[in-house]
Design a protein with these regions (language model features):
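Surface-exposed loop and membrane-interface regions of Gram-negative outer-membrane beta-barrel proteins
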Residues: 73-138
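Cleavable N-terminal export/targeting peptides
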Residues: 1-36
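Residues that define the transmembrane beta-barrel architecture of outer-membrane proteins
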Residues: 57-61, 98-102, 138-144, 149-151, ...
């Protein structure tokens, strides 16, 4: 689950993803030497996606690969350690195992005029699981997305073609977000700001929709490396099972995060 939260790179030189990404979906990618194939690896204090904790306040390791053709076509894979699926069904017998998220995406991104770039594609979130209860929703999710970037601002819209991350009856959910990544011109520091709204469809999910936000800084360390810090929060209803930890804490509560990324 990307976005692209804590800015963690699932984005290549030609692919802005959400995916967001710990501080994922709206941070600038760390880009190594330009080329058709790039890779990235990230260590994060926590993985948050659309403001919701995916690792229950624990660190995450993440990484991915991207191929970008000069025509604008791109395809890629991004992966992260997670705990939210097994946490959601804690107490189930036998124990649910779902330690990893695997994202597969493809799309087309092109500068249509000076300073204006359009991007569109499809994203599959895949969660290899075992012992998932038969009554549980399938966490695997398919979304299509469209985005436009002007200068340092990106507006993106995502629409789910399946139920959203296991919430039954939520097909047709949508997420819209605005990300600002402003180069301060000071010592390789970029100011990151983000606000998004997750609309969860279906009458069975009346309290699942919420707003999330982020404010942070990314520092270019050179040699394809960066460090990012951010404060992330949401107004998600902590009584909703998908937003509640096994100990009853709100998984969307405000928190500070830090991540280190290396691009190849």
């Amino acid at each position: 689950m990307k976005t692209k939260i804590l800015a963690l790179s699932a984005i290549s030189a030609a692919c802005l993803m959400m995916m967001s990404t710990a501080m994922a979906e709206d941070a600038p990618a760390v880009v190594a030497d330009p080329g058709p194939v790039t890779a990235n690896v990230t260590l994060a204090s926590e993985y948050r996606y659309r403001g919701i904790a995916q690792t229950n306040s624990k660190p995450a390791i993440q990484g991915g690969f991207d191929y970008a053709h000069e025509s604008g076509f791109y395809v890629g894979n991004w992966n992260s350690s997670i705990s939210w699926v097994s946490d959601t069904y804690q107490g189930a017998n036998p124990v649910v195992s779902a330690p990893i998220e695997m994202d597969f995406y493809a799309g087309f991104k092109k500068e249509v005029t000076e300073g204006v770039t359009l991007d569109g594609g499809v994203l599959q979130y895949y969660y290899p699981t075992s012992n998932l209860p038969t009554t549980a929703g399938n966490p695997n999710t398919t979304e299509v997305y469209a985005a436009g970037t002007y200068s340092f601002a990106t507006l993106k819209y995502s629409y789910s073609l399946s139920d959203l991350f296991g919430q039954l009856g939520s097909k047709g959910s949508s997420y819209v977000d605005l990300a600002l990544n402003y180069d301060t011109g000071v010592e390789g520091i970029v100011l990151n700001a983000h606000v998004g709204y997750q609309k969860v469809a279906g009458s069975a999910n009346p309290n699942s929709s919420y707003t999330d936000w982020k404010l942070g800084l990314t520092k270019d360390l050179g040699h394809g490396m960066n460090v990012a810090v951010a404060y992330i929060g949401t107004n998600a209803d902590g009584t909703v099972a998908f937003y509640q930890s096994p100990t009853g804490q709100n998984l969307g509560r405000g928190t500070g995060l830090i991540s280190f990324t290396k691009a190849f």
